[in-house]
């Protein structure tokens, strides 16, 4: 479980409203996401070990997509996936992991249906970039602050009354949680993308500093 260190009001902003202003130049670290293990459509294990040195973008995705999705799958595809798919030379370390659930948030073992759908609606769908996985979403969504737990929280305004199904996560190369953001609106997805870019700038700046010190 990740226990978030910011105050409850900010937690509610991040989880419930998903609003944020850029008042910092670096993304805060909220804690280690912990151990997790999923299985992708190729039968390969996706875990905290396989994702070392990668920026991992987590979502949940429903077998009812694209007709009924917790995240805006069309905007997620156009604003996020397509950009990173077309820029694998420089951004091949950014990976997508979508945990498949049914419309009620229960884990789904058979991935054939959703893989067929994504191949049909997502241009250039590539499982090596976008891992669609089976497993318990609680492994990464068990995020808590002041007795408010994202995985077990309920809200009448959320998909299936479960806010975590709408929530995107940024986990960095060291398995640290860096951002929690809803993914059901275009503006929030754009904001999420900006934070991924901000994290990448942090890595670029750190790498440049190391290179400078070695000269």
Where are these regions (language model features)?
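N-terminal targeting signals for export/organelle localization
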Residues: 1-39, 215
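Structural microenvironment flanking redox-active thiols in thiol-disulfide oxidoreductases
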Residues: 73-143
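Short loop/turn microsegments at loop-to-beta-strand junctions
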Residues: 33-34, 56, 165-167
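Hydrophobic alpha-helical segments, especially N-terminal targeting/anchoring helices
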Residues: 39-40, 171
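Structural micro-motif
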Residues: 128-130, 141, 145-155, 161-169
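Short active-site neighborhood of thiol/selenol oxidoreductases, capturing the structured segment around
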Residues: 48-76, 95-100
């Amino acid at each position: 479980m990740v226990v978030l260190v910011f105050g409850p009001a900010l937690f509610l902003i991040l989880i419930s409203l998903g609003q944020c202003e850029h008042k910092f130049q670096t993304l805060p670290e909220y804690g280690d996401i912990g151990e997790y293990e999923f299985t992708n459509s190729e039968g390969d294990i996706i875990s905290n070990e396989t994702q070392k040195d990668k920026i991992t973008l987590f979502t949940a995705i429903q077998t009812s997509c694209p007709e009924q999705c917790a995240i805006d799958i069309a905007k997620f595809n156009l604003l996020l996936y397509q950009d990173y798919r077309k820029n694998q030379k420089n951004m091949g370390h950014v990976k997508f992991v979508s945990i498949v659930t049914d419309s009620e948030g229960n884990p789904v073992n058979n991935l054939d249906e959703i893989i067929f759908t994504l191949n049909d609606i997502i241009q250039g769908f590539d499982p090596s970039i976008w891992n669609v996985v089976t497993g318990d979403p609680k492994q990464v969504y068990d995020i808590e602050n002041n007795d408010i737990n994202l995985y077990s929280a309920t809200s009448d305004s959320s998909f299936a009354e479960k806010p975590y199904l709408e929530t995107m996560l940024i986990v960095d190369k060291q398995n640290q949680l860096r951002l929690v953001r809803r993914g059901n609106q275009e503006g929030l997805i754009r904001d999420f993308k900006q934070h991924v870019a901000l994290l990448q700038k942090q890595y670029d700046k750190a790498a440049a500093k190391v290179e400078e010190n070695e000269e």
